[in-house]
Amino acid sequence: MPEQNSIRIRGARQHNLKNVNLDLPRDRLIVFTGVSGSGKSSLAFDTIFAEGQRRYVESLSAYARQFLGQLDKPDVDSIEGLSPAISIDQKSTSHNPRSTVGTVTEIYDYLRLLFGRAGSPHCPHCQRNIAPQTIDQMCDRVMELPDRTKFQILAPVVKGKKGTHVQLLSSLVSQGFVRVRINGEVRELSDNIELKKNQAHTIEIVIDRLIKKEGLQERLVDSLSTCLKQAEGTAIIDILDKPTLAVLDGGKKDDKEALKAAENGQAYHAELPKEIIFSENFACPEHGAVMDELSPRLFSFNSPYGACPDCHGIGFVRSFCPDLVIPDPEKPVYVAIAPWSEKDNSYYLSLLYSLGQHFDFQLQTPWKKLTKEQKEIILYGTEEEIWFEGESRYRNKQGYYRRFAGALNILQKNYDETNSDAIKQKLEKYIINQPCHTCGGKRLKPEALAVKLGQYNINNLTSVPIRQTLERIENLELTSRQAMIGELALKEIKARLQFLLDVGLDYLTLDRAAMTLSGGEAQRIRLATQIGSGLTGVLYVLDEPSIGLHQRDNNRLLATLTKLRDLGNTLIVVEHDEDTIRHADYIVDIGPKAGIHGGEIVCQGDFQTLLKNQRSLTGAYLSGREAIATPEERRNGNGAKLTLQGCCHNNLRNIDVTIPLGKLVCVTGVSGSGKSTLVNELLHPALQHYLSRQVAFPKNLGEITGLQAIDKVIVIDQSPIGRTPRSNPATYTGIFDSIREIFTQTIEAKARGYKPGQFSFNVKGGRCEACAGQGVNVIEMNFLPDVYVQCDVCKGARYNRETLQVKYKGHSIADVLAMTTEEALTVFENIPRAVNRLQTLVDVGLGYIKLGQPAPTLSGGEAQRVKLASELSRRATGKTLYLIDEPTTGLSFYDVHHLLNVLQRLVDKGNSVLVIEHNLDVIRCSDWIIDLGPEGGDRGGKIMVAGTPETVAQHPSSYTGKYLAKVLQS
């Protein structure tokens, strides 16, 4: 391969890579594949991308480098032919609640620009178009009235204010005005006008009374000028008497001039407004709603100029949840309010007692037996003042009249005003995020939401699925001026929306919080953004872009990757998806297995080369030499079932779902069809509410039945098992407790009186204090990356010399942490409690990982399997429900085979497993399928079919069934 057309890697030894030498073609779509933990990410991200990023950063000044997070130099001899590198992975999803799909893709920035420059402001109260008008424009509008129309010009000086307004009326007389209109009635100022003090009044000066005719303009301009001066820029044209109009199709015909006008084809007016309101200000003439001059910042929820004043642009507020404050409605009133049921609550008891006296309930009455009104009074307070009697906070006997603020408001005040972290922490468990009442979750202030472009405000474009947003943008009803101003912004918005459609994200909305996106969705959004940038000559490194994507949408993703390549870029894609592997220009298979058994280039070349390679596990499954067998029989389950009724959250359309227990159940459907909503946002919280009462029951779920068949619910996801190097597989699974106990039984440990704490690297005693048990010391280098230096005292062993002198079968505690699971299984083969947990790690395919491997270095798939192993080693109750969201993420065909064996074992032990999955191997091996659809977003949310894989495969309208039928036949 010519040097200039290739990326040449020599001596790559990062992590488990074994001195890899590799030449990769430029401007091609390259797929790195292999089993989980084989070294794919180590080569793609930690070597190739890291070196490309490091070289770019090193080209900057030392001053600039101190502001950039730098990557360490990877362990590689050389990389030649490297282009500027951009990483698109799953780990960099924003956790900022202010970040949305619109802001990440920058579409929202263009929308802000568009509305700020071409928008049309309206009154937030009456939706009247707000625009400043000159006197000439006002005069022209009045002169459009039919001839002989009688009208009067009014200057509103008081709008709905209480008072007698004696001074104002006296002032008007002295200025020479004759009449005023008060509360809709015209009165002479010479009359003795007496207004009620406690009543709201509207007062308008009658400036002039006129009849529309030719030659009226000069007097009209003078009168309007006087009116605008008196009413601070506002004028009202009150139509007093409409002229008789001629209508040729029928009606009055006694006006000869009108008839003549009609016969000559001149315009005539069938309807006239009762009033015409003018304003020379940027304000609503009726409600006085003032609009600042439009600018993009008015539409930014991250700016004080545009953000909702109550939620500050987040869209939700943190407030106390009634379901958490009253977790058990069976309890009597005096202990039902959980935060008040703890010790020293006599003050609150006296409040409740007084409320009971006034509103006729007993403190011993169960909460659920109170009337709706009584419950609302206790929670939200009273408008009227009532008599309270009892001890004050300071133990003084007293009585007084006052309003009761309500338990929720009292708790909120206590939380907001306390300086005690302990009190805040205690109250936090009763607080949830709830949509802001002021903006309804729209994030913006009313003035911003009242600005329209064509027929839509900005929320009308961001709150609907992207597919619908594009339709609305293309059908905007714009004036020629608006179209000219917005031409470039509209072009950019349409292009970026189309890119999102191309990667299968048509069901998302632009106002969707980025923190709620799955890893696959976030990655495809960044992929769409990169296509929009139009860069060429770039090296893109992607991590499984097909995650969370239904088989139906794969072709759209592949077309996007091809488009990015055809722009003149090189793509390295870490992927396990068969369609992507087949579509690749060049394939690199890394393995043959994981960890110390991997790190080699097993195969490189095209798809046919991969199929023929006898060492490649990927090739073995793709060629059919290895296969995951479809179960011959489907389980009947244990007869129990969970039934969710009235599911209407997000896009779910008030569906009823039945989940059989004692089975492996798959929830399937295209991306955005409602799978995660059903399982993660309805089923899981409902189960938590039932089991612990520490989570509110989902508002958009009618009811759930069959809960007595479940005593534990466990979510197994791909989040890290720990955030620090102190956490590792040994500590997470509990193996380390057994190992430390074993070491205390040695002769040396007994002689020294060592307890299990001596062998912990987290507490003082046996650990090395020079590095606090970490094995390394961190040295901050300012504009260079932090350097991790092996501890000089313990040489990375984590323990002090005395602890390391204690040996079991010739191995110190540090030696054991450095062992792989397989090696440890041999060492502790005679210790049943250790063997049980170690064997489950081997069974889930993690025989290669070290017991002390820091948690942050584990892949998502590895972390998930550590959790599965931990669950497998526990004694089964037969009433546990496992919820697993896309467990095949990051797993090869070989790993999926292992995973399925583990899931089947969990079910065989009497448990129930519910999986959200797109992988057809997992779906066809399940006992029951619940398929949602038919499409994503607002076109999804229905149950297409529920039944065995064979039943689903026969359904004519199910996309899942269509692809499932093919694999079942093969």
Swiss-Prot record:
Record domain ABC transporter: where: 340-617, 637-965
Domain of life: Bacteria
Coiled coil: none
Keyword Kinase found: no
Main location: cytoplasm
Residues bound to ATP: 34-41, 669-676
CC terms in the record's Gene Ontology section: cytoplasm; excinuclease repair complex
Protein's UniProt keywords contain Transferase: no
Localisation per UniProt entry: Cytoplasm
Keywords: ATP-binding, Cytoplasm, DNA damage, DNA excision, DNA repair, DNA-binding, Excision nuclease, Metal-binding, Nucleotide-binding, Repeat, Zinc, Zinc-finger
Zn finger region (C4-type): 284-311, 768-794
Assembly and oligomerization: Forms a heterotetramer with UvrB during the search for lesions.
PANTHER family linked: UVRABC SYSTEM PROTEIN A
Job description of the protein: The UvrABC repair system catalyzes the recognition and processing of DNA lesions. UvrA is an ATPase and a DNA-binding protein. A damage recognition complex composed of 2 UvrA and 2 UvrB subunits scans DNA for abnormalities. When the presence of a lesion has been verified by UvrB, the UvrA molecules dissociate.
Miscellaneous comment text of the record: This bacterium is considerably more resistant to UV and gamma irradiation than E.coli; the E.coli-like SOS regulon model is not an appropriate model for DNA repair in this cyanobacterium.
Sequence similarity: Belongs to the ABC transporter superfamily. UvrA family.
HAMAP family: UvrA
Protein name: UvrABC system protein A
Organism per entry: Synechocystis sp. (strain ATCC 27184 / PCC 6803 / Kazusa)
